[in-house]
């Protein structure tokens, strides 16, 4: 039995001699009991702990549902009927290209700057400053609310047509009921939103497959669906606009199909790894959406007549194999797109309120639950969406959404352009007019380390060593004071000796006189980060004074050599000729080596910003002017109520100054840059002694001292006359 007891002890206690692989006898039973389901009354329906998502279950799904929206199901046939197949594919590609440039610009901003959880607002605010970021953020929230109203209205129109109810108030009633239901899901938490989106995404895929299969399995000539025909495709290839329509009006109606590309940025606070999840998920969603759009345009142009494409908005339902599945996809896309807007807009509004960009909205910054669900912001955005529901027409709301989002995308594109130009200005080799100049900063040594040569002024360390030779320190007093301190610590308060001027100079300049000249550059390093040294000095003095019963306000000088050692440069600082700089609040970083970072180009972003502004005015110049006017008013208001907002990471880059400099360069040859020699705040003043006579027998009898004599004014004048 004596041999069995140790083994039994091992099995019961789970370990012996540090072994961690041995389990308890009843480990399996305990594990099974932990995995058993709880009673139904203890199940938590709502989210009580933070939930984070990844690339495919979070970003890709949300972007696809928002991009693959009601515009695709209701307006693709109308687009083909006006622009034709060829120009329709060009228009779809152009819409996706504008969205792609904006996504790449957003990825570039996230790569270069640290972005918070505010999505579009955080990107613009970090780069262009709080005033511009707050202005664009408010306009983006407004656009999301209008887009949500448009999606709900499209859903209500389809339901009313299905029920043969053409009353406008029926459409509005259905829209309000749906909006209230979506607000309830949003309040339940982000976990339920993502779960519902996964189900909706699956149903969307089924409805799309139903449309593709139905295009070659049956015909419906009475409703314009005549099947594949080469002649029909030739007739539908080129544009033939209805009266009052043009390429840009069609673009304005169809562009909201791509407004969901920024959803991934808006949910950055709920992602596991935003720096990886957002780029991969957004780019994958854009590529998939472009392919499906092109398939829809080509199929509708090859199987349907132009007249029905123009005037029958539900032509895609006639093509589908099972019309109910297509309607299900339409309903789901409408609800999902609206839910995406109701998810992103309140969180951006919450971020703006938390940063107190607009002090009047600070009460909206509160959140409920572990994911900080913005309850108050959800209600505000819901009311704003409800107000636009009463307009009740998709073709009226679509241009408003387009122009608002074009302004937002232009701001994102310009943000990446400006932050890249600012980064290049900071790292330009021709800065200060010299190709190899080094910029002095408060965290770099004011005295650059060079070897001592003939004619040099020396260093502060050498100057202090000369002071040692002039004022001999009394080395015999230190042991006595130390011993007296050890004998009676209480008397140290009253018998504290005052240090000579030489030692105070040593403490001020952090010089170590115990190191020999063989240390070279290490002994000459002067750390000039005064803020850190002062904080260290005060902490060291207060700590020592508390330990020894001394009032810290009684003296500002260090009490012993240990205090001087605290101020000495660290080994990391002495090992290099330059001191590592502090990371500023808005540090612009270099692009990573990822594959998507290679496609981020600031010139393309700049062209995208200009193109977005031009498209705004071409689509509807009145709406464009109204948006710009509201943006200017918001900018001035935010600057007035909160003038102390951050200037942004690209504050040193001025667009107008860059334009003026470019104009001067084009008009005439650039003038040679002026070079300014700026002396540092602490000059490298020092003294150096040199022995002019050699050590040999010829001069052995000569005294080792210098002679001096007084010369009167008359003798001085006579000597040089």
Curated annotation (Swiss-Prot):
InterPro entries assigned: AA-permease/SLC12A_dom (IPR004841), SLC12A_fam (IPR004842)
GO MF assignments: potassium:chloride symporter activity
GO BP terms, alphabetized: cell volume homeostasis; chloride ion homeostasis; chloride transmembrane transport; potassium ion homeostasis; potassium ion import across plasma membrane
- Region of interest: Disordered: 473-505, 533-580
Please provide an example of a Pfam family that matches this protein in its UniProt record: AA_permease
Q: What cellular component terms from Gene Ontology apply here? A: membrane
Keyword terms of this UniProt record: Chloride, Ion transport, Membrane, Potassium, Potassium transport, Symport, Transmembrane, Transmembrane helix, Transport
Biological role stated in the UniProt entry = Cation/chloride cotransporter.
The record's family statement is:
Belongs to the SLC12A transporter family.
Q: What is this protein called?
A: Solute carrier family 12 member 8
Question: What organism is the protein native to?
Answer: Xenopus laevis (African clawed frog)
Point out the gene that encodes the protein: slc12a8
């Amino acid at each position: 039995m004596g041999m069995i007891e140790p083994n039994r002890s091992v099995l019961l206690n789970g370990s012996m001699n540090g072994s961690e692989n041995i389990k308890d006898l009843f480990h399996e039973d305990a594990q099974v009991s932990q995995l058993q389901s709880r009673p139904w009354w203890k199940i938590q329906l709502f989210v009580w702990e933070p939930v984070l998502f990844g690339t495919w279950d979070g970003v890709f799904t949300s972007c696809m549902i928002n991009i693959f929206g009601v515009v695709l199901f209701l307006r693709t046939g109308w687009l083909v009927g006006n622009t034709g197949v060829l120009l329709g594919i060009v228009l779809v590609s152009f819409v996706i290209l504008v969205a792609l440039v904006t996504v790449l610009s957003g990825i570039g901003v996230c790569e270069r700057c640290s972005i918070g959880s505010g999505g579009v607002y955080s990107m613009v605010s970090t780069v262009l400053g709080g005033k511009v970021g707050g202005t664009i953020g408010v306009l983006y929230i407004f656009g999301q609310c209008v887009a949500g109203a448009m999606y709900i209205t499209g859903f209500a129109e389809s339901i009313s047509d299905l029920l043969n109810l053409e009353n406008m108030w029926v459409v509005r009633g259905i829209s309000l009921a749906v909006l209230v239901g979506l607000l309830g899901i949003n309040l339940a938490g982000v976990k339920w939103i993502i779960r519902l989106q996964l189900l909706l995404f699956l149903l969307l895929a089924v409805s799309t497959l139903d449309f593709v299969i139905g295009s070659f399995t049956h015909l419906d000539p009475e409703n314009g669906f005549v099947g594949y025909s080469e002649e029909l495709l030739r007739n539908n290839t080129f544009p033939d606009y209805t009266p009052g329509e043009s390429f840009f009006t069609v673009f304005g109606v169809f562009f909201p199909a791509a407004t969901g590309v920024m959803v991934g940025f808006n949910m950055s606070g709920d992602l596991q790894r935003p720096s990886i999840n957002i780029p991969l998920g957004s780019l994958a969603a854009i590529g998939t959406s472009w392919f499906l759009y092109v398939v829809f345009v080509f199929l509708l142009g090859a199987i349907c007549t132009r007249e029905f494409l123009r005037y029958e908005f539900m032509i895609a339902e006639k093509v589908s194999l099972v019309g109910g599945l297509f309607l299900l996809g339409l309903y789901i896309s409408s609800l999902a797109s609206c839910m995406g807007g109701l998810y992103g807009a309140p969180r951006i509004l919450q971020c703006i309120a938390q940063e107190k960009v607009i002090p009047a909205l600070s009460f909206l910054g509160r959140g409920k639950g572990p994911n900080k669900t913005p309850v108050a912001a959800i209600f505000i955005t819901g009311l704003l969406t409800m107000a636009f529901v009463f307009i009740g027409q998709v073709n009226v709301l679509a241009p408003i959404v387009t122009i608002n989002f074009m302004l937002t995308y232009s701001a994102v594109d310009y943000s990446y352009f400006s932050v890249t130009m600012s980064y290049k200005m900071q790292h330009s080799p021709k800065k200060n007019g010299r190709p190899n100049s080094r910029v002095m900063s408060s965290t770099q040594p004011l005295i650059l380390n060079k070897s001592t040569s003939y004619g040099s002024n020396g260093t502060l360390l050498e100057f202090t060593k000369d002071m040692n030779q002039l004022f001999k320190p009394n080395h015999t007093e230190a042991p006595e004071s130390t011993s007296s301190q050890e004998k009676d610590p209480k008397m140290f308060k009253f018998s504290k000796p005052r240090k000579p001027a030489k030692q105070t100079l040593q403490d001020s300049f952090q010089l170590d006189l115990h190191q020999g000249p063989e240390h070279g550059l290490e002994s000459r390093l002067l750390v000039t980060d005064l803020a850190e040294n002062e904080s260290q000095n005060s902490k060291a003095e207060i700590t020592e004074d508390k330990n020894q019963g001394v009032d810290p306000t009684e003296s500002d000088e260090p009490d012993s050599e240990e205090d001087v050692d605290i101020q000495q440069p660290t080994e990391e600082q002495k090992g290099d000729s330059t001191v590592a700089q502090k990371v500023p609040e808005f540090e612009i970083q270099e692009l990573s080596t990822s594959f998507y970072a290679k496609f981020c180009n600031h010139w393309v972003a700049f062209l995208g910003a200009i193109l977005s502004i031009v498209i705004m005015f071409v689509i509807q110049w009145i709406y464009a002017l109204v948006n710009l006017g509201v943006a200017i008013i918001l900018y001035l208001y935010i600057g007035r109520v909160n003038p102390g907002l951050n200037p942004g990471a690209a504050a040193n880059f001025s667009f107008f100054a860059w334009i003026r400099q470019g104009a001067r360069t084009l008009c005439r040859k650039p003038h040679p840059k002026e070079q300014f020699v700026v002396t540092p705040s602490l000059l490298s003043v020092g003294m150096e002694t040199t022995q002019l006579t050699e050590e040999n027998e010829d001069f052995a009898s000569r005294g080792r001292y210098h002679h001096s004599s007084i010369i009167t004014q008359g003798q001085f004048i006579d000597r040089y006359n």
